[in-house]
Every structure is written in C-alpha cells, then in structure tokens.
Amino acid sequence: MSKKLENNGIWESSRMMLPQHREELLKRRSQQPEEHRPPRREDLELMRDRILLPVMISIVKKRIQAIEASSEALKHLYSKVAQVLLQDIQKDLSKVEQTMLDERIDLTQEGKDTEMIWYRYSFHGYEDTFTITRDYMRTEVSVRIGRYSDRLITALYARLQDHKQK
C-alpha cells in the first residue's frame, strides 16, 4: 500500500476498497493471533443441545412409527401430536446449528463405549474435550421431551381458551 494511503483517516473510513487493499487488510488480519478463550456456559449448553436434540429427534421418529403401526383407536391423533413435537425439536436443532456456525464452534464425536461418549470441540481457537455418559443422556432426553410436550400442551390449552372467548 502506498505511503499516501497509510494512516489516512479519510481513506481508512471509506467504504470502497480496491482489491489490492482488501488483500493487504486480509493479510494483516490473518497475521494477528486469534483470541483463545474457553467457551462460556451458554456455549457449552449449545454444544450439549447439538448432541441431545438429534437423539430426541430419532426417539420421536421411532415413536411415531410405533404409533402408526399400532391398533390404537386414537393413533392418528397421537401421531399428529408427535409430528408437531418433532417439528418443534427440528426447528430448535436448526437454530442451534446456525448459532454454532455463527459462533465458529466445531463439535465432533471422538469415541464411545458402552457407558460414555467423548466429544472434541473447537471454540475460537480453543480446543478441548468433554464426555457425556449414556445415563445422563437418557435422563436429559427424557426430561427435555417432557418439557417439549408440556410446552405443546400449554400452547394447545391457550389456543382452546382463545377459541372459547371468541
């Protein structure tokens, strides 16, 4: 970059940028060390959600198939409710995945055995691992599906109340 353009407040604040200046800026940014900080609690919860939500989705899908194959008199109702529940969980998973992309959080499964699953994550240059036990996963998935169900029932009751008032 020419001496005339360096440290020139007018040029630096300009929104137009020539390709060679952009290359210089990108080169300078790549030379700066990236901040290595451990993830906050919210970031760890995001990673945990990214692990648990797909498990919940597969469980709900299996239950939908079991309901549809049953001879239950209200199987169509149960199936439809489970499908709404599934859509809600899938929507949340999509949000979690987008947030992880935006936050540059990378999560990969490293290994597993009969009791635990190990994950490696990268967060803004900081790398570490964590472990989730299968017992914790079972319990947490059960609790979360219960919360999603409660939220769905609450929304249904609220809608019924609105309908009665009209």
List PLM regions with ranges:
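Hydrophobic alpha-helical segments and helix-packing faces
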Residues: P39, L46-D49, Y78, A82, ...
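Generic structural signal for well-ordered, non-transmembrane alpha-helical segments
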Residues: I51-P54, S58, Q83-S94
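Conserved non-transmembrane functional hotspots
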Residues: I67, A73, Y78, A82-V84, ...
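Low-complexity intrinsically disordered segments
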Residues: D88-K166
